[in-house]
Amino acid sequence: MAKIVIKVGSNLLVKPNGDIDKSYIIELSRTIAGLKKKGNSCILITSGAKAAGYGKAQKANCEEELYIKQALCAIGQVQLMKLYELAFDMYDEKVAQILINRDDFGHRQRFLNLRNTLIGLNEMGFIPIANENDTVATSEITFGDNDILAAMTAIGWKSDYLFLLSSVDGLMDDQDRLIKVFTKDVVLKKMEKTQWGSGGIETKIRAARAASAAGVRGCICNGRDLSAIERFLAGQNPGTGFEPSKKPASKKAWIGFLSHTKGEIIINNGAKRALMMKKSLLPVGIVDVKGSFEIGDVIDVRTVDGEKIGRGIVNFSSSQTRGIMGYQSSQLTQQLNRSGSTCIVHVDNFWLVPE
């Protein structure tokens, strides 16, 4: 059966007065439990910790210093998980909490540990409930919004479906018509962020497009009507669908969509052609190096015009690459005083931007 990631935001979980909507959590839990009983594997990405923290601490507004907001998230996360545990208990399902930050995806070993944990929880029959680890998040390591966290989880877990639940039916065009299938040339109606959420419809689009590019079928739909999930799985389209590309290999999916990049390598047209023909990146095709990186880091590869060609794991540091760029491989064996390959990025460690 299918592997499904479902993301629910604060706009659905929080009432207008700031309280967590317990009845909605019960209905969401019933829906996910039903999916699991049909043989599907599910992961829930939830927001709402900050709002729950405000309620527990009896704070009246959202304007607080960062350290207070982080403390409120720590308070609220406990309350939120209590509600989920009680709700899923009603349907004889067990849950597990996972708190994630951006670095957990960006470093490959931590990403593999996270993925193995998700696999293990599903094998044991637990439903993972994930949220960003707001208490330690900084601007450098934050997702910015749980839509992005959901997309990265779906990519890393090699999910079949990603549902981004919204307070509207899906994406609307500039004529106020529902867009059934997203294409990059659609003209969207402008929509606003909610009080309790940190993202908007643009973030949902970015998340769904990233997941679909990695082979995950996406849907932005109305979370007030949770039957939309079952209907989409049955082949209907109650929201806005995002058609998936072919799934890349697991390692290349990590390189292309989850890794942190430490710099850039600028290449000429000959190197671009070679990479598009699934060949390795050699020193002769490099015209510039930007940033500082070490062996094993991930870098972006761009043309002199700024076009992003892909990402790859480098076999040389930035200083080494600067020293050998432009040289033919045959010239480098003696200069480097080393045997073996002189390719900067091997084709097996390179992710090519989909056309």
Pin down the residues of each PLM region.
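C-terminal catalytic "cap/lid" subdomain
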Residues: 1-94, 98-355
